[in-house]
Amino acid sequence: CTNTGVNLLAPGKTPKNNIQFLAFFVNTIMAAHKFGVLFMASIATQSNSHRLGAHEAPPAVMSVFTGSTLSAVLDSLEQRVSEKKMTPDEKTEIKLDIGKIPNILLDNTDRNRTSPFAFTGNRFEFRATGSSNNCAAPLIVINTAIAEQLTQFKEEVDTDSYTHLRAHET
């Protein structure tokens, strides 16, 4: 949320709000991809490692669950956007489609309890912290990783090196 209470991970009703949502959503996923080892290190205890690796979900592997609706939206964008320079018509078509992102209901995102980092409609949940552990260290790591990724994203946008939205690096 912003300092005024705006949830940046809530899909909006307008194309502008959905672009904002997608930017924060994709950059949060990218932060988990880049810094997943740090996410896991922040929750590492002997008992939690045993719990994650043997008896309970989520597993000891860092993964992100987005739900089928958002996965389909991201897959569609990725297939339609390429490394080439986009024509104005292609850009307009994508902008129109971004405006059509459906309302994300808890029902279609919260089915997977085995992912340690899951999107649940308007937020990500980090489910790997042990029940008896303090969540301060994981929150510091996650917030710092997302801030670093957003800084890198802004630098790339400012230098025009981002010609399209991407959900992941290859």
Q: PLM features: residue spans?
A:
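Conserved small/polar residues in nucleotide/adenosyl-binding loops
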Residues: 163-170
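Generic recognition of flexible, low-complexity loop/linker segments
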Residues: 111-116, 133, 137
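Generic structural hydrophobic/aromatic packing signal, biased to beta-strands
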Residues: 1, 28, 32, 119, ...
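Low-complexity, intrinsically disordered regions enriched in charged/polar residues
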Residues: 67-71, 95-98, 136, 140, ...
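An acidic, glycine-/histidine-flanked metal-binding catalytic module
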Residues: 123, 127-129, 134-158
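Loop-rich catalytic cores of soluble enzymes, especially ATP-dependent carboxylate-amine ligases
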Residues: 1-111, 118, 160
